[in-house]
């Protein structure tokens, strides 16, 4: 009896030691506002790479202010990784664009290019906004400070000859902007993200909004000026009652710090492109189908993390 009890105690102690030896790793993915596309996609990826896909890993999607805030959080150690627009990541790494005059974020590294983010200019029906130029004199939200959308909105306004002084500018999260459009206290707002965006779909279902085209020579000039931007079309009926809309797009990227462990990021990258992750992405969000391994290093702009680079070499995406 005593021997049996002793054996049980030894086994229990051994399990406790083993449990302590395999401590959990927590890995945050900073995303964006809960009404956008980053947050649900981040949740799908976090679930796909967590234990058992990567042993002892607990990944979580964290709501945030968006691209600029995510890069700053990674740099400051407030997040292990995050989503960023390709232009914001490049500007941060090189100390140019919106990061001009600030220290370069030289440790910023790419895990994967994810999907194209489409520029949305959402306008209240009855506000008589048919083009970007019609925003003059209107109440317009450019998104909140720290977001990539704010950077893009300012670039778009400038391209069409509209200054912030020409509009009644507000700086709101997309869901808050949508609520103000709904109660007629805002005329339009910018959103950059994968379609369909849930908050915009809800607005469109009421029949109260239009998606305004961002096209023409002004858009073509932006594409030539910024290599990250591409001509895009939001297909008809993506949003109820809205026809096909010409617009622009920029790549959404998953970025991290060079300081993150090489083996850990290798395993995370491998899990991202596993069959289980594929099923989750395909079934979990309309934009999930656009996240494909073949495009993982397209339009990189910043260096790959050593762990991600190792994986892409193994599967033949890199030589």
Protein language model features and the residues they cover:
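Bacterial N-terminal signal peptides
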Residues: 7-16
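N-terminal (or domain-start) structured segment
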Residues: 24-92
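Pocket-lining segment of extracytoplasmic ligand-binding domains
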Residues: 86-88, 97-98, 127, 164-260
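An extracytoplasmic/periplasmic, membrane-proximal ligand-sensing/linker region
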Residues: 172, 176, 182-183, 193-211, ...
